[in-house]
Amino acid sequence: MKNIPAVALLLTLASVNVFGQAAPVVGVADPAPLFTDKDPVLHKNKQAAMHIVIDLLAYGHWNEADKWLTERYIQHNPGFSSGRDTVMKAFGARGGGRPIPTDPKEWSTKIVAVTTQGNDIVCVASVSTRPDPRNPGQTYTTTHFDMWRFVDGKADEHWDEGQINAAPAGGGRGGPAPGGGAPGGAAPGGGRQ
């Protein structure tokens, strides 16, 4: 009889999904203030990060990449090559871009947080919606991040959670994993679904 509470607890725990239901990731209501700072250098770098995330990645204005990326732009995502010209050639061919909403609350990329280290590193976390492999036809949200090191107000180096896909059946090269560094087939440095 002494073990009844322990057995009841064990049976209760066994009936609960081990992974549980994670809270959905949501963006902040107004992301614009996250890209500002009292320090003028950090403010310039946060603004550049905002333009990379919104103008380039979300809305495809790759013709403006030279405003926000250094010429050497070092890419640590294994699915993409380094160099601003390489990025512009690869993603600029997609067209001139879509109109950017003037109200940041209407941006397609939902910003979760912007963090910094010193005044040259800026990290932007955003919502990423992915297909749920456990439940076909359903999705879940997680957090995508892009981190840059800035030099003179331009991104000089980039990191994200990029992964390499397996090679396609029948040969060929693998590419960036879905959502791993370029969710939704977006450009290097992120992209959002």
Task: Label the predicted regions.
Residues T109-T115, S128, T143-R149:
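Hydrophobic/aromatic beta-strand elements that line small-molecule binding cavities or substrate pockets
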